[in-house]
UniProtKB/Swiss-Prot annotation:
GO terms for molecular function: xenobiotic transmembrane transporter activity. Its main location: membrane. Keywords: Cell inner membrane, Cell membrane, Membrane, Transmembrane, Transmembrane helix, Transport. This is Multidrug resistance protein MdtB. Part of a tripartite efflux system composed of MdtA, MdtB and MdtC. MdtB forms a heteromultimer with MdtC. InterPro entries: AcrB_DN_DC_subdom (IPR027463), Acrflvin-R (IPR001036), Multidrug-R_MdtB (IPR022831). The keyword Protease does not apply. Belongs to the resistance-nodulation-cell division (RND) (TC 2.A.6) family. MdtB subfamily. The lineage of its organism: Bacteria, Pseudomonadati, Pseudomonadota, Gammaproteobacteria, Enterobacterales. It comes from Citrobacter koseri (strain ATCC BAA-895 / CDC 4225-83 / SGSC4696). NCBIfam families: PRK10503.1, RND_permease_2. It is a multi-pass membrane protein.
């Protein structure tokens, strides 16, 4: 009968070692919970970290940017500015459109923000123009967030007006109802309408004016309540033919009588079926189309939303005629799925590599199976907690699990190695398990909690970066905790049942060769360590040198914010001279599209021209370029962008700005390039003075490329300078002048046609085909107080001036946004510093302020908090270690290993040409938790040898280094191989994962070599320091 160690042996593991059935069932429960949880986890690109954002759009056709600003945007801004929880308010007022974007604090629920926005709009209603065609409309969407899906609707047999009508009523409305959809926009502007084009000469000859015609149409088409009759026995509802539904009815409308004969609308105007706004157009590739852009609500899951739309599409397209084609041009979920799939493959590869390294060291199948079980059990069990915390399967959580592969096996390796050592000495497996697990239990707890302590600061990071990495930190911490539980329960129980002297001693040729190799390595290490211990001050100088080197590398390494991803979609802005018309812009767009579609990496293209709230001016066009899948093209997105810009540069009269779409969107405005810098003033005049000066300076900086500004103050304006005295003498008011101009040139919506399914507008304008340009102004006629017809030229002069094409505000003040990219040989940190230095040379007045926006602002915040984040991680780990060891000194010895990790990580990033971005910084913080385990394993055994065997400190630490060399090497290689697949990643989303892998592999390699020698030296130096303190201050030490 086997004699067991005393009941005190085994520590917390004893109960689980002695009760294998209960332990097995507990692990099965964890496994099942994880498997079930995995099925309920949504899939996403990144954790849901969107700011609650709402966009408010107001359309006022024909209004100038100045009118839109003063009459629409400003009243709305005053009401919105009073809302609590508002983080930032930006607006863009252009010809006929006002867009106000409201970004709220992360802590404010989107539904609460929606209620506040609706209340503010209601409060501003009385301040808005009375003839506003429609009230402001808000959408729970971030305009800078690229659409999750883009669909093109084309037809070769039907006009686009009919196509849009069907798409709007049969498709767009249904998609809008899908959970997670924030906004469905139909680009192309082919909404059906009845267009009335007045012949100015004809109405003038008849003594009529456009205002007469407008009043006639408005009064002839009404749709109002008429009442009902309630008799003794029957009730009758009243109805009438007060609605005109067709073009022919409008043509036959009598607008006046001349000499007893009717003057019909068709006599003085061309009445036709057309589009509500003729200055809007969209194209899919080279074909005119209605383009549907589907944007998600902030916080909505992209995958589930896109899947729901995909499921609906077959049913929706069946309701359309056969001649109408619906094509999915882009679907962001395709790349998201590919990225997640690649990360899942890297996770499985990491598990395989870790198990392989375990077998290489243990050279025993049963001993390899034990930690091989611990790895998937710890990772799968994490899924159950992720479901409970509303996490998702995304790139960051999968990266956390991939890194955790190397972490979770560490505990099991330490336990197995210690138990195996006692079995090899002749102990029975059960006794060895109890003794080995009890001896190593405190070390496991120290390793676990000190590693989790490193992650604690990540949980308290503020703003969007903190939200972004919260799932990463918690997922990793949960996996480590489950690993510790498994290592103290299942692992020693399996060791007691599966290991034996015979199995451990059973060796093949490979095992014997590996054993000899490890013995020689340990022997050499012992020789080198003895020499190092004889020269402690030289070793200490090396340790101090690594600290200084890490600081230097930190200062000089290029710094960035977030890796630029290749998601297969490029957003573009095409810019033409400020006086460009819709027709000329459409022609330029077609030329550019032809060039872009010839590129072998391009799969499809959508383009939009016109002003509708998303596009600020007629001289710009929006492009979305969809690339072929990564495995079907030779170049990544940045090279494709450079190639496209070079090719389009040959097209005269246009500038093309391109940027790849990103999963992380912090901006609230659609910009031309990736990064933004704003100049804000109290007046437009101040901006007009300083914007050109700063623009000239910024364009000269080599750290910036594609520098542009949204300041456009050279738009042509026909300024009507009315002689108010003359007008007053004739009884003509300014309202009469404005109405006449609006009727002629504003595409004025004067009436509404109501049907059972939709509503359509009647559009009034002058027919300018015969009198184009400013000559059309001579055709304007007004009615004097005595009924006479007065030409506009009799009371006004037309002056050609310049004015802004759009007016932008930030928090209610005028602002200009500079957009820029960063060249390949510079980093975002270089660009930011160059801009700050340039700003100082311009000597801006005190009433003009500058600020970075979007990801550039987040970069500044992250960079400023990085040092404090690392300090917080070190302090947190010191506190945990101090509590565990009941010592002020030993935690310092353990933490002395950290500079070596920093040097390795920073050197690896610089050699690989990677920036120090937030992903790489997370890797460095994780290294802080990993590399100290070498010191913990050494110091734990050294302290035990001093305490239990009475060994001298030098002998104790020397023996500890030799005894723990194999598990130290094994655990370090396991962590390294866990990060290796991330470092070598080449698939979709590799840009996001690679910096983490590079930093960790480099840090582990350097720290592994150095800490094996620096830790024992520092341990002995602090031991001498402790003895010195005790000898100098015996009383104080004794009291302590």
């Amino acid at each position: 009968m086997q004699v067991l160690p005393p009941s005190s042996t085994g520590g917390p593991s004893r109960l689980f070692i002695m009760r294998p059935v209960a332990t097995t069932l507990l692990m099965v429960a964890i496994l099942l919970a994880g498997i079930i949880g995995y099925r309920f986890l949504p899939v996403a690109a990144l954790p849901e970290v969107d700011y609650p954002t709402i966009q408010v759009v107001t359309l006022y056709p024909g209004a100038s940017p100045d009118v839109m600003t003063s009459a629409v945007t400003a009243p709305l801004e005053r009401q919105f500015g009073q809302m609590s929880g508002l983080k930032q308010m930006s607006s863009q007022s252009s010809g006929g459109a006002s867009v106000v974007t409201l970004q709220f604090q992360l802590t404010l629920p989107l539904d609460v923000a929606e209620q506040e926005v609706q209340a503010a709009i209601n409060a501003a209603t009385n301040l808005l123009p009375s003839d506003l065609p429609n009230p402001p409309v808000y959408s729970k969407v971030n305009p800078a967030d690229p659409p999750i899906m883009t669909l093109a609707v084309t037809s070769t047999a039907m006009p686009m007006t009919q196509v849009e009508d069907m798409v709007e009523t049969r498709v767009a409305q249904k998609i809008s109802q899908v959970s997670g959809v924030g906004l469905v926009t139909l680009s192309g502007g082919q909404r059906p309408a009845v267009r009335v084009k007045l012949n100015a000469q004809a109405i003038a000859a008849l003594g009529l004016t456009s205002e007469t015609v407008r009043a006639a149409i408005t009064s002839a088409n009404v749709n109002s309540a008429k009442g009902s009759l309630d008799g003794p026995t029957r009730a009758v509802t009243l109805s009438a033919n007060d609605q005109m539904q067709s073009v022919d009815e409008y043509r036959q409308l009598i607008i006046a009588w001349q000499n007893g004969a009717p003057v019909r609308l068709g006599d003085v105007a061309t009445v036709e079926q057309g589009a509500e706004n003729s200055w809007l157009g969209a194209w899919a590739n080279k074909e005119q189309a209605i383009v549907m852009n589907v944007q998600r609500q902030p916080g909505a899951n992209i995958i589930s939303t896109a899947d729901s739309i995909r499921q609906m599409l077959p049913q929706l397209t069946e309701s359309l005629p056969k001649s109408v084609n619906v094509t999915v041009l882009s679907d962001r979920t395709t790349n998201i799925r590919a990225s997640v799939t690649d990360t899942q493959f890297e996770l499985m590869l990491a598990i395989a590599l870790v198990v392989m390294i375990i077998y290489l060291f243990l050279r025993n199948v049963p001993a390899t199976i034990i930690p091989g079980v611990a790895v998937p059990l710890s990772l799968i069990g994490t899924f159950a907690v992720m479901v409970f915390l509303d996490f998702s399967i995304n790139n960051l959580t999968l990266m956390a699990l991939t890194i955790a592969t190397g972490f979770v096996v560490d505990d099991a390796i330490v336990v197995i190695e210690n138990i195996s050592r006692y079995i090899e000495k002749g102990e029975k497996p059960l006794a060895a398990a109890l003794k080995g697990a009890g001896e190593i239990g405190f070390t496991i707890i120290s390793l676990t909690f000190s590693l989790i302590a490193v992650l604690i600061p990540l949980l308290f990071m503020g703003d969007i970066v903190g939200r972004l990495f919260r799932e990463f930190a918690v997922t990793l911490a949960v996996a480590i905790l489950i690993s510790a539980v498994v290592s103290l329960t299942l692992t020693p129980m399996m060791c007691a049942r599966m290991l034996s002297q015979a199995s451990l001693r059973k060796q093949n040729r490979f095992s014997r060769a590996a054993e000899k190799m490890f013995d020689r390595v340990i022997e050499k290490y012992g020789q080198w360590l003895a020499k190092v211990l004889n020269h402690p001050w030289l070793t200490l100088s090396v340790a101090l040198g690594t600290l200084l080197l890490s600081i230097m590398l930190w200062v000089f390494i290029p710094k960035g914010f977030f890796p630029v991803q290749d998601n297969g979609i490029i957003q573009g802005t095409l810019q033409a001279p400020q006086s460009s018309s819709f027709a000329s812009m459409a022609q330029r767009q077609r030329q550019v599209s032809d060039v872009i579609l010839k590129d072998p990496a391009v799969e499809s293209l959508t383009a939009f021209v016109g002003v509708d709230g998303t596009n600020p001016a007629l001289n710009s066009a929006r492009l979305q370029i969809n690339l072929k899948p990564l495995n079907e093209r030779d170049d990544r997105v940045q090279k494709v962008i450079a190639r496209l810009q070079h090719a389009v540069a040959k097209v005269p009269g246009v500038d093309l700005y391109l940027q790849p779409t990103q999963d992380l969107t912090i901006d609230t405005q659609v910009s031309r390039t990736q990064y933004q810098f704003t100049l804000q003033a109290t007046s437009l005049d101040a901006l007009s003075t300083w914007v050109p000066q700063l623009m000239e300076k910024l364009q000269q900086l080599p750290q910036l490329s594609d520098v542009s500004s949204d300041w456009q103050d050279k738009g042509l304006v026909a300024y009507v300078n009315v002689d108010r005295d003359s007008a007053s003498r004739l009884g003509i008011s300014m309202a009469d002048v404005d109405n006449a101009l609006y009727n002629a040139f504003g595409q004025r919506l004067i009436s509404t046609i109501y049907t059972q399914a939709n509503q359509y507008r009647v559009v009034l304008e002058h027919n300018t085909d015969t009198t184009p340009g400013l000559a059309a102004m001579d055709t304007i006629r007004l009615t004097s107080s005595d009924g006479g017809i007065v030409p506009l030229s009799a009371i006004a002069k037309i002056e050609q001036r310049f004015a802004p094409l759009s007016i932008n505000h930030l928090d209610q003040f005028p602002v200009t946004t500079f957009s820029f990219n960063v060249p390949d040989n510079y980093s975002l940190g270089d660009a930011v510093q160059a801009i700050l230095d340039t700003e100082k040379t311009v000597n801006l007045p005190v009433d003009i302020t500058t600020q970075f926006q979007g990801s550039t602002l987040a970069f500044q915040a992250a960079l400023g908090s990085t040092v404090w984040l690392i300090v917080a991680a070190v302090v947190a780990m010191y506190i945990v270690l101090g509590v565990l060891y009941e010592s002020f000194i030993h935690p310092i010895t353990i933490l002395s290993t950290l500079p070596t990790a920093g040097v390795g990580a920073l050197l690896a990033l610089m050699i690989a040409g990677s920036e120090l971005d937030v992903i790489a910084i997370i890797g460095i913080i994780l290294l802080i938790g990993i590399v100290k385990k070498n010191a913990i394993m050494m110091i734990d055994f050294a302290l035990a040898a001093e305490r239990e065997q009475g060994m001298a400190p030098r002998d104790a630490i020397f023996q500890a280094c030799l005894l723990r060399f194999r598990p130290i090497l094994m655990t370090t290689l396991a962590a390294l191989l866990g990060a290796l697949p991330l470092m070598l990643s080449t698939g979709t989303g590799a840009e996001l994962r690679r910096p983490l892998g590079i930093g960790m592999v480099g840090g582990l390699l350097v720290s592994q070599v150095l800490t094996l020698f620096t830790t024992p030296v520092i341990y002995l130096l602090f031991d001498r320091l402790s003895l010195y303190v005790k000898s100098r201050f015996p009383r104080q030490e004794e009291e302590a």
